[in-house]
């Protein structure tokens, strides 16, 4: 049985491209907002890998040269400010925002924060909007670097919903060249929260169709 390995954000991008007809035209950037921050880019129907397969590591773009240290060896990496891990770290430092967050998973802590924000809790809302602004800074970088037709926000942080999308859109309007920013469509993922699972199926399907000899003896 063939085994195919793919990065989670790229698999998610392929799932968005194959299973959402609205995203099948133009170029697509799947902005994975999970325990880490990732990016998968599809242009002309093809996943972009770069020379050594390490392209589109948006989570390790430094947005603060004097910022928080990252395990990658850099400082100020985007995912230190808007990943589920980073949010949970902030909640653990301020446990009154989400009582009991210390015993929660990263996804549970984020869901609890977003629920409180949606219920009108001011402190939770401020933290959620701060995270959304950092997501927006990443979106600006994606637009400037790749000029995609679509940016799709997915995974744990995207569950913040419309308030997240509104703040990201506002940051993009403020920080991109108007003619470019307004022609980039930013949406929330319409696929299940963990689009990478759907993406794994998409990777298998694509390889089956493109390389049938991997699966069958066609000699």
Model-derived segments and spans:
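Glycine-rich phosphate-binding loop of actin/hexokinase-like ATP-binding domains
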Residues: 21-82
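Conserved phosphate-binding catalytic cores of ATP/NTP-utilizing and phosphoryl-transfer enzymes
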Residues: 7-28
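General beta-strand structural signal in soluble alpha/beta enzymes
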Residues: 2-7, 41
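AAA+ ATPase active-site-proximal loops
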Residues: 10-11, 37, 153
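Short Cys/His-rich Zn2+-coordinating modules
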Residues: 13, 52-56, 187
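ATP-binding/phosphotransfer module of carbohydrate and carboxylate kinases, centering on a glycine-rich
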Residues: 18-21, 25, 66, 74, ...
